[in-house]
Amino acid sequence: NLAQLIDSAVFPGLQGGPHDNVIAAKAVAFKEAMKPEFKDYSKQIVNNAKAMADELISLGIKLVTNGTDNHLMLIDLRPSGLRGKGKQLQNALDKAGITVNKNSVPYDDASPFNPSGLRLGTPAVTSRGMKESEMQHIAQCIAVVIHNYRDESKLQEVKAEINELVSAYPIYPGLTVLEFLPILMKVINLISLGIPNISFAFSSLKPAIG
């Protein structure tokens, strides 16, 4: 009787109908996570984050916890005289081609809509194949933007550097636009047919994580 009560509480009480496309996506993700390459990728994410954090600190940028042991870090802008400038810095970095998120920091008395921190991580750049030396370069670009966030010419200079950097580390090495078009057409056709499980259209594509 107890088992029946638990089962009925879980379904339909707490769970709805299964989504086959989500189940398939999870299966693919779990399969990828079992591979040695994923372990190496995860280690590189942390190594990259530590390299970026160390470089930011050496450039006078304050980090909450004074470093990182995982995939992300939180910049405290207050020691740089930029209390409540998180949103402005986020937008400036975005103009320069660097994606971060405005974020509150401990004991931040600024509004969460205009906080005093920036959160950034390394999984995306690691997926492109970048390593520690590239993290140092990115950290240097971030520091330039933080100190010159109102200078449009500086932002454009950094953007040019970032564009040059990412062009050397394409998401799918060797894949041209013309080669990608048939895959895109297949996905569009599947969507137009109302087929939700389209993830396998990309099964032959592997980001550069090694």
Describe the function of each predicted region.
Residues A51, E55-L59, Q88-A96, V145:
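Generic non-transmembrane alpha-helical segments
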Residues K62-G129, E179-F180:
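Conserved PLP-binding catalytic core of the aspartate aminotransferase-like
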Residues N1-L82:
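Active-site C-terminal subdomain of aminotransferase-like
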Residues P112-L181:
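PLP-dependent enzyme catalytic core of the Aspartate aminotransferase-like
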Residues L184, S192, S199, S203-P207:
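Low-acidity, Ser/Thr- and Arg-rich intrinsically disordered low-complexity segments
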